Amino acid sequence: MPIIRKVLARQILDSRGNPTVEVDVYTENSFGRAAVPSGASTGIHEAVELRDGDAGIYLGKGVLKAVDNVNTVINDALKGMLVTEQEEIDEALLALDGTPNKSKLGANALLGVSLACAKAGAEYTGLPLFRYIGGTMANTLPVPMMNVLNGGAHADNTVDFQEFMIMPIGFSSYSDALRCGAEIFHALKSLLKSKGLSTAVGDEGGFAPNLRSNEEAIELVIEAIGKAGYKAGSPTDKGGLGEAQVMIALDPASSEFYDSAKKRYVFKKSSKQELTSLEMAEYWEKWASDYPIISIEDGMAEDDWEGWKILTDKIGSRVQLVGDDLFVTNSKRLAEGIERRVGNSILIKVNQIGTLTETLQAIDLAKRNGYTAVISHRSGETEDSTIAQIAVATNAGQIKTGSMSRSDRMAKYNELLRIEEELCGQAKYPGASAFRV
């Protein structure tokens, strides 16, 4: 019987050198290990990441309290449970915490346990994790959102918007799409060097040069696509119709430059201009007309529901509008967004909500209501590649896991290559059909 015998946590370091939680789950016949990611630009509605707060140790970012919660309270509660009963395990974790935002035990403690249990369950059944979670129909490799140029909170430069990404849609296989992304990444590096610009990378592996404007950033990415020998879409392609091979995705992380007191979007790092919600929506409308943009994440601030509605009404029929800080992988927040008819996609970050079951529920709710789901990493990552497995398990069709550098990002891309190989002829790459616009 796959009965949980021991749950053991430890403090390890993430890709930014900050402490995070790693959990091992042991049964008589199987073992699972999971490491928890951490964000830089976090939404105020996210589940609580429990930190120690001792400024003299890891600058207050230690996670020994969360580790202790796993090794005592959670270990005692889960011992004797069947590791294959994922929903029961996650329900037990939620009951142990008892708070709406996981502030008692910490979402970082709960998530590590939840994912490690899933891995131990998969090992017990002899199935890969994507098959264990998703069943026999799990066969869709995701279109990657590759973050090749960074700004905002992810970089020390003059670019307001956090992520400029490429999406290789005009390919029949994931491996070909990955090659396209890698070649564009190297073309962009060469282009930046030729212009005397920095090729230092940000937290997620994208370049972070000092540029004159946000417009220069997106234009450099488009130039790199052509330099690599690929065809960027046109603004009228609407999801890659025609001969487009690559489209652009953005994550401005607008909550980071929204002044709630002024109710203005303030471009602090570049032009210093201040925009109302209507003006910000019109700004994105113009960009969607001028550039081959297929997806915008957090185009408006997390609590600017009015702004989100304006933006959705303006371009939601032709651009994927992804809610990250808006929805925070939370089914209740997503349900509110569906009711208000804002956005048309949800970003899925497992540590925003804290358990695998709640993550899968959010994805299911999105799909049932015609929203797409984008499985995502965090800026503080580890070598753990669970999100690659979840992307295939749920047939999400899209994944956001950084640039073509830094091994913490490449671990996810390489895991998807292995899954594609394992699926062999069953593997599907959706390309432009991953979008519903």
Swiss-Prot record:
Binding annotation for (2R)-2-phosphoglycerate: Q162, K349, R378, S379, K400
Q: Which domain of life is it from?
A: Bacteria
**Which cofactors is this protein said to need?**
Mg(2+)
Binding, Mg(2+): D251, E297, D324
Pathway named in the protein's UniProt entry: Carbohydrate degradation; glycolysis; pyruvate from D-glyceraldehyde 3-phosphate: step 4/5
Q: Where is the active site?
A: E204, K349
In the record, what terms sit under GO molecular function? magnesium ion binding; phosphopyruvate hydratase activity
Q: Which GO terms describe its biological process?
A: glycolytic process
Tell me where it mainly resides: cytoplasm
Which EC class heads this enzyme's classification? lyase
Reactions the enzyme catalyzes? (2R)-2-phosphoglycerate = phosphoenolpyruvate + H2O
**Keywords per UniProt:** Cytoplasm, Glycolysis, Lyase, Magnesium, Metal-binding, Secreted
Q: Which SMART domains match?
A: Enolase_C, Enolase_N
Q: Where in the cell is it found?
A: Cytoplasm; Secreted; Cell surface
Bound cofactor: record note = Binds a second Mg(2+) ion via substrate during catalysis.
The UniProt entry's GO CC annotations, sorted and at most eight, read:
cell surface; extracellular region; phosphopyruvate hydratase complex
Q: What Enzyme Commission number(s) appear in the record?
A: 4.2.1.11
> Which family does the entry's similarity section mention?
Belongs to the enolase family.
Query: What exactly does this protein do?
Result: Catalyzes the reversible conversion of 2-phosphoglycerate (2-PG) into phosphoenolpyruvate (PEP). It is essential for the degradation of carbohydrates via glycolysis.
Listed name of the protein: Enolase
Q: Which gene encodes it?
A: eno
